[in-house]
């Protein structure tokens, strides 16, 4: 079913969305791999699936499987249904099983669709998966899918995907939340870099220089505190 769905969707995406894919040379051709991508549209998993010549698995809400045609398409493209109330532990266990058998897994670290504007903040699950499985992480940006849908209409729009070099981390059994968070925050800037390369809005920059105290002019010395 995967090959049939891919054979139908890939030429359609190239024609209708003028799909552009950059950095495919960074994608491992075999073995487990985690794709960490930003999430803008329900179309993201479908266009991401065109990157590989093998199935790419990802999480989808169980409600999406209620329509028979959509359930067929989701199953064909590697989606596995989860309940909204399902615990993170169960989802991580399913994701680990996919990677342990040598397959590809698509993860949206933001946890939900984020639009418009800059990318959102990541959750630490992707870092935990990278540590627990030792699978390389390919940072990916998807740009343009948020403009494809207007209401219930699907309209032509340029869609671009950019992959960065894979990131590898030593395998760690039962990593601490702090370590998983640190690895996630090593991965996410690489996703944001691909996003900005495609023209995406960068996140707000924090001024490293502290603000001047009220009433102090630029270049004027600050008043000393009274003893």
Model-flagged regions — what are they?
Residues 17, 54-56, 77, 103, ...:
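A structural micro-motif
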Residues 90-227:
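Non-catalytic C-terminal accessory region of glycerolipid acyltransferases
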Residues 1-9, 184:
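Onset of an N-terminal alpha helix
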Residues 11-31, 168-169:
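A short, well-structured juxtamembrane/interface segment
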Residues 25, 87, 143:
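Residue-level "edge-of-site" marker
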Residues 5, 14-15, 27-86, 93-94:
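Catalytic core of membrane glycerolipid acyltransferases/transacylases, capturing the structured
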């Amino acid at each position: 079913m995967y090959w049939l769905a891919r054979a139908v969707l890939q030429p359609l995406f190239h024609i209708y969305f003028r799909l552009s894919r950059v950095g495919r040379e960074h994608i491992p051709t075999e073995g487990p791999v985690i794709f960490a991508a930003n999430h803008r549209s329900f179309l993201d998993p479908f266009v991401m699936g065109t990157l590989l010549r093998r199935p790419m698995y990802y999480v989808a809400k169980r409600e999406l499987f209620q329509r028979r045609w959509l359930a067929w398409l989701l199953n064909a493209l590697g989606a596995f249904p989860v309940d909204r109330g399902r615990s993170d532990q169960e989802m991580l266990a399913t994701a680990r099983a996919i990677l342990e058998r040598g397959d590809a897994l698509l993860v949206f670290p933001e946890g939900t669709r984020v639009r418009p504007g800059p990318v959102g903040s990541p959750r630490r699950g992707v870092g935990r998966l990278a540590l627990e499985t030792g699978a390389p992480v390919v940072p990916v940006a998807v740009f343009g899918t948020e403009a494809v849908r207007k209401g219930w209409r699907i309209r032509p729009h340029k869609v671009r995907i950019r992959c960065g070099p894979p990131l590898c981390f030593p395998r760690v059994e039962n990593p601490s939340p702090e370590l998983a968070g640190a690895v996630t925050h090593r991965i996410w800037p690489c996703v944001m870099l691909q996003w900005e390369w495609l023209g995406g809005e960068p996140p707000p920059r924090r001024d490293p220089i502290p603000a001047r105290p009220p009433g102090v002019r630029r270049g004027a010395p600050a008043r000393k505190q009274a003893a």
